[in-house]
Amino acid sequence: MNLLDPFMKMTEEQDKCISDAPSPTMSDDSAGSPCPSGSGSDTENTRPQENTFPKGDPDLKKESDEDKFPVCIREAVSQVLKGYDWTLVPMPVRVNGSSKNKPHVKRPMNAFMVWAQAARRKLADQYPHLHNAELSKTLGKLWRLLNESEKRPFVEEAERLRVQHKKDHPDYKYQPRRRKSVKNGQSEQEEGSEQTHISPNAIFKALQADSPQSSSSISEVHSPGEHSGQSQGPPTPPTTPKTDAQQPGKQDLKREGRPLAEGGRQPPHIDFRDVDIGELSSDVISNIETFDVNEFDQYLPPNGHPGVPATHGQVTTYSGTYGISSSASSPAGAGHAWMAKQQPQPPQPPAQPPAQHTLPALSGEQGPAQQRPHIKTEQLSPSHYSEQQQHSPQQQQQQQQQLGYGSFNLQHYGSSYPPITRSQYDYTEHQNSGSYYSHAAGQSGGLYSTFTYMNPTQRPMYTPIADTSGVPSIPQTHSPQHWEQPVYTQLTRP
């Protein structure tokens, strides 16, 4: 029995090592490694037998078990074991280490592991009752108390092992457990899907934040041509190809309509002056028709209601936006807001300058520059009302036909905005007032015929409604004396 004591202790220690995975253990690969002999401890002096037996040698267990079982049992066991091919048993390290068939290569031991492995053997030999976890804690405490000179042998051995490991496995790459990588993959997918869904919204919020400073925030972020395949909505991330399926475009449009409607008084989020209607792909325009515009009615701000009297400067301009012509600037019919997207109007500064503030001073320069499709009667200075009035019925309808969004004809709004249909198709009452504006009637020819818009140099600088508090708006007294409020009321209350 005395002879077998070392073997008994050794098997106990190895069983502990196997059962206690979290602690640093002497496992398969390290058992045959040069570390035990070269670890700088006196392990091999105190227990020379240890290195002669690789761990798990079946003979070792047989010897220790021989006195426990009768001979017949031992013979039966040995007979069974002889007939079994042990190569069929998967090595536990390989099973855990990788899903592939190649054996798992362990990391080279660091200095502490060299120390812990050597010391654990000695301590387990001297105190077999110690639990492996307690042993590991103690080894860690002792390691922290060692000074540099005491640690040096372990550090040198660890460096030697590292160099040897590099020679043995030149292309070794440390790969943490696969379980984490699965979680990472899932989170990446989730992030990716969030990216696709959220990015338009996030960009919108950013644009809304920017919009007071620059109404051209989008044209600054992306050149207008960059998204010509999509409606001029919030820019999608640059990687998105132009020819996206129209679904994202539609979502963007819906999302876009909401900020337009809610931020009715804000300056436009999109500056269309640099956008050419030709850049919009026809399929985007045609797809716009499928929108259910009725859902946007709920977003119409109360002060935008057609019935608002024209005397509140800012409010009236906003109410004016509901004219069919005002499609660019407001939720007006949401449908018309879409029209604005289609023919990127200079966002009629949807900041709709209060119509009575409508830049009378610019009337002179607006005449020639008026090629912008007059989509907003109020925006034009009084001198141009006659042209608008006289040409608007035919040309607005013509314009709608060109855009081909029949579903947005104001018939959708017939019930809720009876005045719109009236003012859209029947401008006689405004034409009667043409005497006020007859002097500018001659210039109207180019008004609607072209969809080109004034470049920034030609555009009159409007004061955006959102900034009416900060930016002093043009005093109403500037409006021409002959332009009387009642006429304006008719104009802004389509």
UniProtKB/Swiss-Prot annotation:
Protein name: Transcription factor SOX-9
Region feature (Transactivation domain (TAC)): 372-494
Reported modifications of this chain: Phosphorylated at Ser-181 in the developing neural tube. Phosphorylation at either Ser-64 or Ser-181 is required for sumoylation, but phosphorylation is not dependent on sumoylation. Sumoylation is enhanced by PKA. Phosphorylation is required for interaction with SNAI2 to trigger neural crest delamination and for an efficient trunk neural crest delamination, whereas sumoylation plays a less significant role. Phosphorylation and sumoylation are induced by BMP signaling pathway.
GO CC, alphabetical: nucleoplasm; nucleus; transcription regulator complex
Biased composition, class Basic and acidic residues, residue ranges: 56-66, 159-174
Region described as Transactivation domain (TAM): spans on this chain: 224-309
Oligomer status and interactors: Interacts with SNAI2; triggers neural crest delamination in a phosphorylation dependent manner. Interacts with UBE2I.
Cross-link (Glycyl lysine isopeptide (Lys-Gly) (interchain with G-Cter in SUMO)): K376
Biased composition range(s): Pro residues: 344-353
One annotated GO biological process: cellular response to mechanical stimulus
Consequence when changing S64D: Sumoylation. Initiates trunk neural crest delamination. Allows cooperating with SNAI2 to trigger neural crest delamination. Allows interaction with SNAI2
Keywords of the record: Activator, Differentiation, DNA-binding, Isopeptide bond, Nucleus, Phosphoprotein, Transcription, Transcription regulation, Ubl conjugation
Location of Phosphoserine modifications: S64, S181
Region span, PQA: 63-103
UniProt region (Dimerization (DIM)), positions on chain: 63-103
Residue ranges annotated as motif 9aaTAD 1: 277-286
GO MF term set: beta-catenin binding; chromatin binding; cis-regulatory region sequence-specific DNA binding; DNA-binding transcription activator activity, RNA polymerase II-specific; DNA-binding transcription factor activity, RNA polymerase II-specific; pre-mRNA intronic binding; protein kinase A catalytic subunit binding; RNA polymerase II cis-regulatory region sequence-specific DNA binding
Stretches for region Disordered: 1-66, 159-275, 326-402, 462-494
Motif 9aaTAD 2: chain residues: 292-300
Alphabetized PROSITE patterns for the sequence: HMG_BOX_2
Keyword Ubl conjugation in annotation: yes
Listed Polar residues bias regions: 378-387, 470-494
Motif 9aaTAD 3 positions after renumbering to this chain: 445-453
UniProt DNA-binding region: 105-173
Function: Transcription factor that plays a key role in chondrocytes differentiation and skeletal development. Specifically binds the 5'-ACAAAG-3' DNA motif present in enhancers and super-enhancers and promotes expression of genes important for chondrogenesis, including COL2A1. Plays a central role in successive steps of chondrocyte differentiation. Absolutely required for precartilaginous condensation, the first step in chondrogenesis during which skeletal progenitors differentiate into prechondrocytes.
